[in-house]
């Protein structure tokens, strides 16, 4: 996904980390997705819009960046479960798109099919600028950030090498998780804080 040097690299902003609350038996009591913003040449892209009740936190995070909901140009949902797309309605000016595997969403931003949790699951792969890059040359100026949705919902899934508990096809879920791990420098999971796979 190399880019010409005269082109702007996308920048990634976490508006809200995801979370998941389970009872002692492991049953899900509450699930709230990560909400991620990408600045691109094509405009502002929001990936997943969260659950009902997250509106205030999302709008405040946008305001902290000097943005309003009307500034969002494109919505991409990693899948169609309500904890990931319930707030699409907040961004009425934005166009919701449904990219296919490998489709270029914007320069430096591409869809990656990651089925298993749901048939329509995708992840968003971003060739992201690191601001500021380290001046000593020890870190790349870009990192591959994968906004994984529920294909890789938590750090625990990565550490234990287990797919999401909720899935329609376990083999596909494992393959999708492994695909993300092989590509990503940084993962923004569906229901946890971002974590780094490579320094």
Which residues does each predicted region cover?
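Zn-dependent metallo-beta-lactamase
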Residues: 1-42, 108, 179-183
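Active-site metal-binding motif and surrounding structural segment of the metallo-beta-lactamase
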Residues: 55-97
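Short loop/helix-cap segments at secondary-structure boundaries that form the rim of catalytic
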Residues: 6, 85-92, 103-107, 198
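Conserved catalytic cores of phosphodiester-cleaving nucleases, focusing on short active-site segments
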Residues: 45-47, 147
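Short, flexible loop segments at the rims of nucleotide/cofactor-binding pockets, characterized by
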Residues: 21-27, 51-54, 74-75, 111-115, ...
């Amino acid at each position: 996904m190399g880019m010409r040097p005269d082109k702007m690299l996308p920048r990634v902003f976490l508006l809200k980390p995801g979370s998941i609350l389970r009872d002692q038996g492991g049953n899900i009591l509450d699930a709230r997705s990560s909400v991620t913003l990408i600045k691109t040449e094509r405009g502002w892209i929001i990936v997943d819009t969260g659950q009902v009740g997250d509106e205030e936190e999302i709008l405040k995070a946008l305001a902290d960046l000097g943005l309003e909901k009307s500034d969002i140009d494109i919505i991409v949902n990693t899948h169609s479960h309500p904890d990931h797309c319930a707030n699409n309605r907040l961004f009425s000016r934005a166009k919701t798109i449904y990219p296919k595997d490998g489709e270029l969403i914007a320069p430096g931003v591409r869809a990656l099919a990651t089925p298993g949790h749901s048939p329509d699951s995708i992840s968003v792969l971003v060739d992201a600028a690191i601001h500021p890059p380290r001046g000593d040359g020890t870190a790349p100026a870009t990192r591959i950030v994968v906004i994984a949705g529920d294909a890789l919902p938590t750090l625990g899934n990565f550490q234990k090498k287990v797919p999401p508990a909720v899935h329609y096809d376990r083999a596909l879920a494992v393959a999708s998780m492994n695909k993300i791990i092989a590509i990503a420098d940084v993962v923004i999971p569906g229901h946890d804080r971002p974590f780094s796979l490579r320094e």
